[in-house]
Amino acid sequence: CNASQQRAIQAAFGNQISIIQGPPGTGKTQTILNIVANLVVQEKTVLVVSNNNSAIENVVEKLEKQGLGFLTALLGSLERKTAFVETQAIEKAIPAEIDSWYSAETDSPEFLRTIQSEAEALQTIFERQERLARARQELSGLQTEQLHFEQETTIDPTITLRRQMPSARLLMLWNELQAAVEWQPNGLFDRWREAVRWFLLKRRIRRLFDGFSRHPERQDLQRLIPLLQRSYYQVRQEELSAEIDRIEKQLATSDAPAMVARLSDDSMRYLRSRLAARYGKGHKRPIFQHITPELLKEYPVVLSTTFSSRSNFRAETLFDYVIMDEASQVSSETGA
């Protein structure tokens, strides 16, 4: 699990419709598996569809590797439905060791609180990692900008700032001066309002700058803007460097891979214990001679191609969730 996968899962459960997208290798299939696992814990039904068989077979294979293949029904074409009916007794048999999956510890509220605490701690780590990446990227961009700025801009050496300011205030003042230079009043009210603003701005300039005229004209502000730009670049880089150093020290005390492994282990223990309570203790799984809605009580995860999914059950059969893998490859007719 990573930050983007975690956000995708939260979005999937927080919205009626959610889109998960990304290039190959970014964990979209793993995200589908995590969503399916959460639905199984909640005893919900889910239909997983795709425009091709290989995509849904990939999902089934990954669930089987986790020992969860007995929850799935791979349907679709007449051939696949026939194969399911004929092989379900063997290929979809409930694991013989399922009773050993049960753990009384997972029934306690404390165990769920532990999982929640682990998830929140991991979320904090992910947020720090992302903020660190953004800060490094911003710092690199500012360094490049400053290099070009210093090569192309002349700064009046006789003008200085009286005191240090945070970058946010420098940027605000920079924009304010730039707007004052470019502002063109239109009408009597605008001219009156601008006269008041100009009076107040000149008072601020006298407090903030040394070596600058105490009675400047509007065009004189152009001499101040390069100084503010340079100060902004310097101060913002100092702020980012300090933030990067702070986050790196925070992350150095955390073992993210170990935290992910611990959360995954505890989550799987909880899932398996719930499955043991549902399918263990001598549970007799019926053998289905036909594909009917009752099948969903035993096989809450149904997989099919998009084109064939409508033919699996009666039209009135409802699933709690539908996951469409590789949705961009599905035509609007079959997707509907």
Label each PLM-derived region with a short phrase:
Residues 317-331:
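SF2 helicase catalytic motif II
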